[in-house]
Amino acid sequence: MRGPHVRHIHNFACHCLGLKAYFREPGDGRLHPHIPAHDLVWAVVIGRILRESSFLSLEWLTHSPVRAELGIRAEFGDDALAYSTERMDPEATRAALAGVLRQAKRNKAFENSPFIGLAIDGTGAGRTWKEPCSLCDPIRDAKGEVHGSLHHFVMISVVGAGLTLPIDVEPYGPGDSEYAAAQRLLPRAARNLGPRFANYLVGDGEYATAPFLHSTDEVGLPVVARLKENLPSLAAAVRARFDGQPPHAVFQEGNDRVEVWDADDFDPWETLQWSTVRVLRYRQHKSDGTLVQAEWLTDFPVAKLGSLSFYRMAKSRWEIENRGFNDGKNRYGMEHICHHEPNSILIVWLLIVLALVIERLYRLRHLHRGDHQIRSAMDLLTWLWLTLGSRSPPETG
């Protein structure tokens, strides 16, 4: 077969993922545009796939001999990217991302997984010492002195389905919070994805509050949340029930032995409008001798969800940490602020998410058709750079 090439990724995104209309009209807010919006947006997306994280590096690419091979027609500078991202409507990119996820589901990208999960979590990125913008959260030492600023956002991502695919991000600044941003993000993402897209939502202990759990009910998603000491009455009841008791079941997960305790008749706390609460405690004995124990709560009844599936849903939360935040920061440039303006920061974060989704669907599904081996992210990156100046990629075995 022909090897991967940047032009193939562009065609895959436009035609297989249905993004042609989005790249033509990506929510451009410029009144008198001279540079096609397609070129500006696609430059950011393909630049992140090529691990080029600054607007200056994109300016260099658009003035290089490989501009046409990148699928970009016009030359432009970093100032054009800054100007356009300041004025783009983020809702157009959010809608496009949700459309890609729906198309991926129709294309059976998740067909080997019994459940499709959504994970939600927050992080900080883009430390700066520049004049603060409205999203800048001051970094203070123990004496209260400010040492730069950090930008924060909440992400929601597909997890537990064989592919980790981020869907949307919501920024929050001073006077706001991760919790409040998540409450804005969840209903929007659920609305954009449509009913019955996912089977559950998983989150850390910060989201184990009655208002947030009721919000998941409103969007029709069962929830799996970490149980910590922020719910003291339930945590005490779990200890009283499970401590000193033999495990209800023991599983072998890979090289790890997992003991579980599982009960679905705990009383809800005063403000939670559930009839009962189900809690799973797992004790994971890793092959290196380490021990991991945690408790998780859910509104899934035992009749619909076994203990092993409950355990796997809880563990799927780590996907957003490892394959969302860590990959986004270390590989796709989420830590780098291209243009220090709130809307531009948000747009670039959303375009990074789009680049990550396109790259993973192309590499892990499109290139993996038939009996072709899965390429690593680094292998694909190397191949794309090696073939960038060639209109005809070499054959691959």
Language-model features: where?
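A short, flexible helix-boundary coil/loop motif
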Residues: 1-7, 19-20, 249-267, 329-331, ...
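Basic, short loop/linker segments at the boundary and entry of helix-turn-helix/winged-helix-like folds
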Residues: 2-42
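Short amphipathic alpha-helical "interface-anchor" segments enriched in bulky aromatics
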Residues: 9-12, 58, 304-339
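Short, positively charged, Gly/Tyr-enriched micro-motifs
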Residues: 31-99, 216
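Short, conserved catalytic/metal-binding motifs centered on acidic residues
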Residues: 43-44, 58, 77, 81, ...
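Active-site-proximal, Lys/Arg-enriched surface segment
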Residues: 82-161
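Electropositive, glycine- and tryptophan-enriched low-complexity nucleic-acid-binding patches
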Residues: 140-196
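An anionic, glycine-rich sequence signature occurring as long contiguous blocks
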Residues: 224-317
